[in-house]
Amino acid sequence: NFYLSIVNPAFEELKSELKKHGRTVEVYTERRDFASIIVQFEGEEELDYSIEVMLYPGLAFPRPVVHFTEWASSRRLRVEGLFRTGIQDYDISDITKDEIIEHFLNEYRNLSSQHNKRIDFKS
């Protein structure tokens, strides 16, 4: 199972590292088609990152989704992304734990730098 063998271990590793930096982290992995990790700092949500699997005939396509609150307007935004650029000829069997971690960290760094809350993660 993609979530049990790839996503959940990635999220647990991220949780452990983020807690070292004073973050409160919740990981939700109960569903078979969705998992999320929510990061808070000083009572405010910094990032809600999830992975959904889109099912198409002959393809199970993993899609990272970021939910966050826009700082200036307080609007709740949803951004759907891709794990890889270029021709999207991959499915859940091609995505690794390290790719999930790297994608999460890139999104987290981008958002945290906008709010001047940078964390120096070991890459």
What is each stretch, according to the model?
Residues K20, V25, G43-E45, N110, ...:
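Generic alpha-helical propensity signal that fires on short helical segments
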Residues I38-E102:
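Intrinsically disordered, low-complexity regulatory segments enriched in Ser/Thr/Pro
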Residues R23, R31-R32, R63, R75-R78, ...:
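Arginine residue identity/basic-tract feature
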Residues R23-L47:
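Ser/Thr-rich, low-complexity intrinsically disordered terminal regions
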Residues N1-V25:
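Contiguous, amphipathic alpha-helical segments that mediate oligomerization or scaffolding
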Residues T96, I100-S123:
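Glycine-rich, aromatic-bearing surface loops/beta-hairpins
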